[in-house]
Design a protein with these regions (language model features):
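Basic, Lys/Arg-enriched alpha-helical interface segments
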Residues: 1-67, 76-79, 87-116
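Portal/gating segments that form or line small-molecule/metal binding sites
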Residues: 70
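ATP-dependent carboxylate-activation loops
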Residues: 83
Length: 116
């Protein structure tokens, strides 16, 4: 995939504003990983997050002992939707963070269905 074929990133809800709260190095790392996704590659550290919905993936970033996550969906031809950006406080992803991502995922799926 060449640079002209990069998928465009769409930030859902407060996902971009929340990302801006990350420390500088974590923001840089997320940017690099999303650039990989834009060019058809997987992030270097990720996992599928099917409990949110089909095709949802989670970028995993560690910075100075802190853990950050960015949930996104890239299964659409020209778009990447960033559903949620957050700092993880415990080993398990919180119900609140899962619910935020799930609501945003459902909104995106409905929007995409209506624009086919």
């Amino acid at each position: 995939m060449c640079m002209d074929d990069e998928k465009e990133i769409y930030w859902v809800g407060s996902s971009y504003k929340d990302l801006l709260e990350f420390p500088e190095q974590a923001k840089h790392d997320v940017g690099y990983q999303l650039h990989r996704v834009q060019n058809g590659l997987n992030p270097e550290d990720w996992k599928p997050f099917q409990t949110i919905g089909s095709g949802v993936k989670e970028i995993r970033i560690s910075d100075g002992g802190n853990i950050f996550r960015v949930m996104y969906i890239a299964k659409f031809r020209e778009k990447i939707y960033v559903l949620h950006s957050f700092q993880k406080k415990t080993q398990k992803t919180s119900r609140k963070d899962i619910d935020i991502a799930r609501v945003r995922y459902k909104a995106i799926i409905n929007r995409e269905k209506n624009h086919e």
